[in-house]
A protein has these predicted regions:
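Sequence-level detector for tyrosine residue identity
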Residues: 7, 16, 73-76, 181
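FabD-like malonyl-/acyl-CoA
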Residues: 1-65, 112, 189-222
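Acyltransferase/transacylase module recognition
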Residues: 4-5, 135-228
Length: 228
């Protein structure tokens, strides 16, 4: 019974799924907002000018040091996914310069096949577009506690939820901190619902002792195993 879950959390657009599942946002409005959000983010920068790169094997503190010690390009942390997996956004010209820096330091990285530099300041036009759309959409108080991508902690107040959804567009997804917050507050079982099992892998990377179940097809519902 999903209603028994202590927390709901989603990664990036998955936060809208979490809000819909918790009863805060009805399904129709969730789809409508996501459609508008997608269009707004695609038009925030000229097509083909922005990109993202995943940096593997180093921690966020080291990434911040690299970014602080350069002045000829500007990149932004977009996703703090897990220990040793950080994603950055920026203009492609800046991303390519950053990749060269990573190569000289022999730091593993993967340039991602994305259409825009999500979750960074380059999305400010999308924020402006979505502010009114989110504020003019009806939200209810969620039945379950929501973990915000922006803060990595819980929220249940309707106006705060709206404000954080707006800020989410150009702020990093603090997934690692979100998972740690839930674990520190007593969560021992995580259930990922949706295609694939990327988030399950991230949770296990953050804490190998945590029990994780993945539901990406109906038959998975009968195979869930929870720790006491």
């Amino acid at each position: 019974n999903l209603g028994d879950a202590k927390y709901f959390a989603g990664h990036s657009l998955g936060e809208y799924s979490a809000l819909a599942t918790s009863g805060s946002l009805d399904f129709k409005n969730a789809i409508k907002l996501l459609n508008e959000r997608g269009k707004a983010m695609q038009t925030a920068v000229p097509k083909g000018t922005g990109g993202m790169v995943a940096v593997l094997g180093i921690e966020i503190k080291e990434i911040n040091n690299l970014l602080e010690n350069q002045s000829n390009y500007k990149c932004y942390i977009a996703n703090d996914n897990s220990n040793g997996q950080i994603v950055l956004s920026g203009l492609n010209s800046d991303i390519d310069k950053f990749i060269e820096t990573l190569k000289t330091k022999k730091i593993k990285n993967i340039k991602l096949p994305v259409s825009a530099p999500f979750h960074c300041k380059l999305m400010n036009k999308a924020t402006s577009i979505m502010r009114d759309k989110i504020n003019n959409t009806n939200f209810e108080k969620p039945k379950n506690v929501i973990i915000s991508n922006v803060t990595g902690s819980e929220t249940q107040e309707i106006e705060k939820i709206k404000d954080l959804l707006i800020k989410q567009i150009e702020n990093p997804v603090r997934w690692r901190e979100s998972v740690i917050y839930m674990i520190k507050n007593g969560v021992t079982n995580f259930i990922e619902i949706g295609p694939g099992k990327v988030l399950s892998g991230l949770v296990k990377r953050i804490d190998k002792t945590i029990n994780v179940n993945t539901i990406n097809k109906l038959e998975n519902l009968n195979n869930i195993k929870l720790n006491d």
